[in-house]
Design a protein with these regions (language model features):
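Conserved N-terminal Rossmann-fold NAD(P) cofactor-binding segment
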Residues: 1-13, 21-28
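Short, internal active-site loops enriched in acidic
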Residues: 7-9, 63-67, 117-119, 202-203
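Solvent-exposed alpha-helices and their adjacent loops that cap or buttress functional pockets
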Residues: 7-9, 51-53, 103-106, 187
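C-terminal substrate-binding/catalytic lobe of Rossmann-fold NAD(P)-dependent dehydrogenases
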Residues: 76-82, 91-203
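General small-molecule cofactor/ligand-binding pocket signal
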Residues: 2-4, 84, 113
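Acidic ATP/Mg2+-coordinating residue in the GHKL
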Residues: 18
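Rossmann-like NAD(P)(H) cofactor-binding subdomain of soluble oxidoreductases
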Residues: 29-96
């Protein structure tokens, strides 16, 4: 790891943007409080990047994620298909882990997506959630559950667990870093994976 200037983006294949302040313990639990400062940060970064390249794939991690991704896609005449955010990939991983734990199975066997905006307005399309083909509504018949499954509680816990980590640890790092690495790996290996990212949808 070393410090470099924006000119080094000229031949970059992938650029990951994590800059800007984050929410802190005891502060607001709403990522939108970061909006004004992080919009300025994003504008500055994109102005610098676009001086040197419009070829690299840009992955946005900074919050509020979806708004910053929108700004990066819309404002700088950068190819929109080369900019996206980590989206609800981390929310999805957390949900699958919680559901797997409740059902006594490895999270890798859980298929379920958290969709929408990263944060308080995300949602879960329950009719797509399954464990090795067993649909959500049949989990109570097929698995020895640790507790009764409550859709509202599962969604709520998925939304707030990151904020709870901030209160306990002071920041989040590992989960979102793994999400970014997951996307980078998918791109580099051309995996053709289906993952929930932040992007502007037209049409």
């Amino acid at each position: 790891i070393r410090v470099g200037g924006y000119e080094e983006c000229a031949d970059a294949q992938i650029i990951v943007i994590t800059a800007g302040p984050s929410i802190t313990p005891g502060n607001s639990r709403d990522r939108m409080v970061l909006l004004e400062k992080n919009v300025d940060v994003m504008n500055n970064i994109m102005e610098q990047i676009t001086r040197y390249t419009k070829d690299a794939i840009i992955i946005v991690v900074s919050n509020p994620l979806d708004i910053l991704t929108y700004i990066a896609q819309k404002k700088f005449d950068y190819p929109a298909n080369k900019i996206f955010g980590t989206g609800t990939l981390l929310d999805t991983a957390r949900f699958n882990k919680m559901l797997g734990d409740l059902c006594g199975v490895d999270a890798k066997n859980v298929t379920g997506f958290v969709l929408g905006e990263h944060g308080s307005t995300s949602f879960i399309p329950w009719n797509t959630v399954n464990i090795v083909g067993v649909p959500f509504d049949e989990f109570e018949k097929q698995f020895e559950l640790k507790e009764k499954l409550d859709k509202e509680k599962l969604l709520h816990d998925t939304k707030v667990i990151g904020l709870d980590i901030v209160e306990l640890k002071g920041y989040t790092s590992s989960g979102v870093a793994l999400s970014a690495c997951r996307l980078i790996g998918s791109i580099v290996r051309n995996e053709k994976s289906v993952v929930p990212v932040s992007t502007v949808v037209s049409g």
